[in-house]
Amino acid sequence: MSRLFTFLCLSLLFNLAQAQLPTPEYKKGQAILSGTIANYNPDDNLIFKIGAPNIVMGTAETLYPTVEADGSFTINIPLYHSAQVRMIIGNADLVILLSPEKETNVTINLSNLPGKQFVYSGQYATINNEWCQPELITKIPPVYRDGDLLDSIAGISANEFKERCINQYKQYIAHNNTQSQFSEDTRTLANLSCAFDCLENLQATHYCLQTAYQKKENITREQAFAAFLDIHLPDDFHNYLKDFPVNHPLALYCYNYRNVVTNFLYDTHYDPLSMEKYLLENAPLTKEEQTLIHQYEAAFKAGVIFRQQNDLMTLIRKYTKERDDCNWKIFSEAKKRLGHILQDSTCLPVDYIRAIYMRSSLYNLQPLTSRQEIMASEITNPIFIGIIQDMNRQMQPRKKA
């Protein structure tokens, strides 16, 4: 036992020694991506775009590099911290690890075989070159977008679906861990990326099974929503989360960390009508507005298209206080729910839920509300804090000279 423990400790020390990446830190700046595209022809109208992520907003700013006639390009990419950015060029869709104020160069030849299409130098060259190799598994596709996968899960239970997802994830991690030709950092980031993609599928379990049912029965999306409205996940369904590396010190390098918390917020009884129900109970609605909501609920439950969707959205926007009250309730419960599963109210995923709560104002180019400021004050992660503070400053009214 003593020898085994010593071996495990030495293995851990070796892995730590091999790993070079530090924990990412907040540092707003411009990453520089330069490169050359072999055999470039301006008349080919090559698709070429970059996605610069904002982890708090869960979105990416789309940038279009200007390519010179000789195929060379240089683009500045705004980042809040070292992170993977997405690059789509031709039929290739990949991520590149970049840092603010650092330059990475890439030579692109799309006619080459996979693994040789992109050759990097500069910052994170080893990780970026290894990431492109076909022997490394770096992503798990969303089940709800794959027709064959949907066919394979039609009629199975939520727990069976969960088991499939987790087994697939474990197989991919086991495979990556045998690829000793790649650096520890590269394998760690690949495994984290697979974990976060798996979490997207697990959180979408109800929707995946619903979409599989829709495809099998050849019914409309509305009919499928109605059929699954009263079907819920087991109360302990999301306990798997404590076995995932959601609090890993390198997690925020990953482009897909946003998959760790989706719109479902780990709610086993997610209710797509929650906002409308809250307004009926708490907002001073007119009789016409009450009727509109009741008509929407009836249409939803009957599985038919609701023709007054724009009127409903206008109504929801009208009752700002009640809408904010409902969102505060939803996010407070989600924060508590995740903290209970992970037994830590200050861990990264719980902080991320707090950060996501800021989106409603920042999306609309508005400064944070008093409630959002209260929840923002609970955040401990420096990257989330830095992004929120920077964006909130930009939303403040400018003082007159």
PLM segments and residue spans:
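Bacterial Sec-dependent N-terminal signal peptides
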Residues: 1-25
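N-terminal start-of-domain structural block
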Residues: 3-4, 69-71, 323-330
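Alpha-helix boundary/interfacial micro-motifs
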Residues: 13, 87-88, 214
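A non-transmembrane, solvent-exposed segment enriched in polar/low-complexity residues
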Residues: 20-189, 202
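Oxidative protein folding and maturation machinery
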Residues: 119-401
